[in-house]
Each structure stands twice: as structure tokens, then as C-alpha cells.
Amino acid sequence: MELLEDLLEEARKLNASDLHITANQSVSLRIDGKLRKTKLLITKEQVSKMLAYILNEEQLHNLEACGELDCAFMDGKGLPYRVNVAKSDGQYLLVMRIIKLEIPSCEELLLPETVQALANLKQGLVLVCGATGSGKSTTLAALIEKINRERKLHIVTLEDPIEYRYVSKKSLIHQREVGRDTASFAIGLRSVLRQDPDVILVGELRDKETISAALTAAETGHLVFATLHTNDSTGAVNRILDSFDEGRQLIRSQLAEVLQAIVCQELLPKVVGKGRVANFEVLIATPALRSLIREGRTHQIASYLITGKQQGMLTKEEHRKMLQEKGLI
């Protein structure tokens, strides 16, 4: 569809992160974290044509049945997008996340050395946390690609939907999409364990079953990367523990045993030019931290983080100051 292709091309030219399309409303773009409205008004008929262009028959049927849908899409130039379709006041809306075709390197993202070193781990659980649109997927993609370039491993990703597309290099990579290649994250994770993986990427720890399967995968000698929608390390630990009504002590012990690091991030506008840069909090799982988790003293994690600089830990305040000193923000 020519109109949609033109909108997507313009969004990329403006370096937008998201394209918002709603029937009988102006098209909006999110640029450098701010929503900007255009003068283009989209009709209900145009939205229907866009949906028919983006979705296949099965997806259209699921959308009609459920009223909302997540999927991946490639435009006429083969450029990728993550799409969410839902209803607002009885009308369909589309939000299209623009995904870069090339996976950025850790250096391009200015990832702290402690974060880059997570790609060298052999096993355990690494959590990457932050709000929606904070760059979690991009950080994980850079780490997975670093492993792909440098290590001879079998990497399996579970995503909903698939965003960045990897090409196997030193590693062998298989990407599985929830809803297409597997029914759910939890079911996919249990299946992955029978596929001889070394590294597993879980797009989101969205329920108790997925969290439990991820902990088991890390416990059985795999390196597991996963995301959570929390703003800080304490919130991430509590989110996992609060997912379980029973057996809380067992989960505390299991998490304390397998956790390697928690990386929390937010995007800040650059002071010069356009674009944003990630500001990080990095918590490394030392023996002392494992004891805090095991003993249920999660309220002390924030204080412990401040004193962990020698172990490579980083608070957002410290990293923000580093970014300011470099003239980035």
C-alpha cells in the first residue's frame, strides 16, 4: 500500500522510533522520545486497507476474534517493524515500532564495560529492565550479536514478535516467534531446553510460568537473557518474587543461585544533535547480594548498589554524571 510505505519511509527519514495511526485522527510520530502530530488525517477506510496490507488471513481472523494483535512486518524494502493493532472507541489503531535493519554494536550504544562483559558469561540469568521504549531490545540485540561474533555457541531466541534478525556467524542462531513458532514463552522455553542451547533470549518474563521456566533454564547450566518492565534492580527482584504466592523461600534461593546481573536503563536526549543515549543502572550478583535475596532483604539492594563500584556496579546517578562529563547529555 503506497500510503503506508510513504509514511514508513518518512518515519525513518525523521529517525522516529514509533508511528501512530488511528482512524479519523492525525498521524503521529515519536521522535527523540516526544510525540509529534502531522497534518495528515487518516480515514477508517485507509486504516482497513493498511491492516489488509500488513496482516495475513490468520492474523486478520485473530484480530477480529481478540480485538488486538502483536506481529512483525517488513515493508516493501525489506525493513522490519514491530506492530501492535488494537481498538480505541471502536476504531482500529496501529502503532508501528521502527526497527533498525543493522544490529548496533555494544560500542555504538556506549554500553558500559560491565554490561558488555555479560556476553562472556557461561551460565546464569541476566535481566535487562526498563519502561517500554527504553531500549531494552536494542541492548539485548547488541549483546547477542557480540556472542554471535565472538563465541561458538547455540543461541535460541523467544520473541513476541521477532524484532532484530540475526545471521549466524561463529554461533548458530535460531529465532522463534510466540504465536507462530510456539504457543507461549513458557511452552517455548520448555521446548528450547531439549534443543541443546547454550544461550537463551526470552523476550519478556510476563508470567509466573515463564519466570519459573527461565529460572530452571539458568539453573541447568544455560545463559539466559530476559527483560522485565521495572525501573530499578530492587523492583526487578521483587517482581519475580511477587509472582509466586507459594514457595517464596524456594524461589528466593533459586533466584539467588542463578542471578548474574540486572541492567536497568532509560533513554536521555543528547545535548548536541539529535537522538538519545542510554543511562544505566548495573547490579552485579556478588555473594553478598545473593545473601540479601536469599534472606528476603531486598529493601537493602539499593544501598548495596551504591557501595558496589569496585565490583563494576553502577547507579543511574553515577552513569548520568559520566554522560554529562563526556558532553553527551
Predicted features along the sequence, with ranges:
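Short, flexible helix-loop junctions that flank or precede catalytic/ligand sites
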Residues: 2-329
